Amino acid sequence: MTLIKSISGIRGTIGGRTGDTLNPLDIVKFTTAYAQFIGGKKIVVGRDGRISGLMVRNVVVGTLMGMGYDVIDIGYATTPTTELAVRMAGADGGIIITASHNPRQWNALKLLNSEGEFLTAADGAEVLRLAEAEDFNYAEVDKLGTCTIDDSYNQRHIDSVLALKLVDREAISKRKFRVCVDTINSVGGIILPDLFKALGVDYEILNGDCTGDFAHNPEPLEKNLHGIMDKMKQGGFDLGIVVDPDVDRLAFICEDGTMFGEEYTLVSVADYVLSHTAGNTVSNLSSTRALRDVTEKHGGKYTAAAVGEVNVTTKMKEVGAVIGGEGNGGVIYPESHYGRDALVGIALFLSSLAQRSAEGRLQGKKGCKVSELRATFPDYQIAKNRIDLTPETDVDAILVKVKEMFAQDGSAQVNDIDGVKIDFPDRWVHLRKSNTEPIIRVYSEAQTMEQADELGKQLMQVVYDMQ
């Protein structure tokens, strides 16, 4: 049983003793602290398809009403839908009930500001302080809040995607795509069919019932996607699409059943955006170098941010990035909003593929396959490892020593905004400590998986030798 309180929200497994799991008492306390912090009068609440979602929703909504807030309950909704709804409704904040890619027994509260964006680290820390202080003041009977059910925001989200200038509805419709989509038995099965209908895309949905009974591990990684990959290998589809339970992460599968590569979701969409809009890009330190290569090809500047969506969006605003995101399949397109959005990613990717296909036909070719599009990008491989430590280990001191070692060496660039990233001319390795476990996560990238894994293990040995 697990309960994790952090600056980004509260998450945990359902059931068990108070203080050890995500339970009604902690939900009340944390929701109250958020309401006290955010101020104002109106809060949007949306949830993914998790089994525990209704229970958590009822506690959250009742607590907000008890604090005097008027709640707009948008029902089953993706994370980006809820983010957009905050702005569209002119609300003071929002609560997303989702544990993203975590297994079915998990749930969480993710907290938004009035812009529909995640709270900053400082704001999240203040909510935690208020929750621990428990100095709460609830509304008197004549000042209790209300709850309004409004299920229009899924369609409004779709409409906003269709209105984006770079979403080429005509080219997509003419291409007559046929796609296979795994929506993991969550909210993607509700909203994505309507998006495909609006785009003129023929689709087949796998795991499309919004029951929260996930058909497989919900993280959209290759090891979890054999069902749709096998389906794609049977033929008849142009593209495979996979989303996580709250539809902020996106992975593609080529027409032959091979993975497009989760890291390359953002790379491919950025390449399309940059071909139409000059500008800069941002991703986090643990994301593929391919985004930098593509950005520089188009004359833009790439900047790395600390891991975490709020860090990426903050850096995007600083450098005026026209596209950004995270290598886990998260596409952030400011023309829509500052949040990871799989609907935006799908529409832009299909636009790119459709336009390339049209150009190919003009040259006497049959069009552009997804695998052919993937082959146009620089090819890198990322290895992921971890170093297990004892609770007594001073992780920060170890990372400082690693930084000093390579800074003195001069053979690589060293970045310490989030752990330590060591950037060599043809490869990189990133070490960062976990906020919840006594471990150091080790990400490394090179042109082959063997080279990437070897680099990661070399740095792991450096750390072991320091203990």
Task: Give, region by region, the residue ranges found by the protein language model.
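Proline/glycine-rich low-complexity loops and linkers
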Residues: I74, A125-D159, A163, C254-G327, ...
